[in-house]
Each structure stands twice: as structure tokens, then as C-alpha cells.
Amino acid sequence: INSDSAFQSTLYPQYKFVKGENDVKGEKALAFARERYALGDGDNARGRHQMEIIKAVIEKMTSSTALLTNYYGIMDSLEGMISTDFASDDISSLINKQLSDGGTWDIKTFATEGEGASKKTYSMPTQRAYVCVPDESSVQQANQLIKKVMNGETISDDDLKLTQKGD
């Protein structure tokens, strides 16, 4: 995985990450995905880290026919640990296409941003809880990117740069 900063995990202090490429497995990957306190932009960085882990898993899976052909065994071992709205038939179709066509995927990510606040929530209406209040302009930008993909358009790196907050 690629880290945009060097840090030591606060939840798993035995794990340190360098800026740039890091080799992670198991608990170390979890430490990377869950960290927010050691990072300047907290929840926003944690969201980017979670996307980085997902991207790395996809890249690993698509680079190995052995992993792809053992898809059902892998999914069985993960039962109860993950959830998705992606239908199993759609996942199977993607795997079969990857096995027959090969190639690499060009994965793009975009993160909405927000600010931390203490507010009452729907789930905790009588007391304040930490929440991340989304920046509406970044949510609108994400919606536009999703619409492009849904319309069959390709997202370029320039599209992401142009839509990032502050550009």
C-alpha cells in the first residue's frame, strides 16, 4: 500500500509506516486502515487509507489467476466479515472476464471531506457524539464523478485534480 505520510499506529503501536510503499498483511493492514489519531486530518486520512487497502486487494486479486480461481474459497473464509451490495453474479462475471481477458485495472479514488464536530445524532439523540460533518461541495463533486462513471465515461487523473477541494 502507499502511505502519503510516515506514522506509528496509535491503536497498534508495534506497527510503523513509512511515507511511500509499505508491505502490509493481516493486522498491520488493519492498523493502517483504522488509524486516524496519528494523522493530521484524522477521519479524512482514515478514509483514504481504507480506499488504499481496497485498491491494494483488487490489484493483488487481479494479478493472480490462482487467487481468482479460488474466489469462492476466499469468499467462504470471509463470510460474516464483509458486506457488499454487489451481487455475487456480478462479482463472478468480473472474475470470469478478468480470467479470460487479463490486464490491469485503472482504479481511481476520490474522497469527500468533512470537519469533526460534537453533535446529537439520530442514533444518540440525547447526547453529543463525535461526527464528521461532510463538506457539501466535496459531496457534490463526488456525485458528479459517480454520474460520469454511471454514464460510461472514464474518470481521468485531471478530473480528480480539478474537483479536489481548494483547486
Model-identified regions with their sequence ranges:
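Residue-level signal for protein termini and structural transition zones
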Residues: 1-167
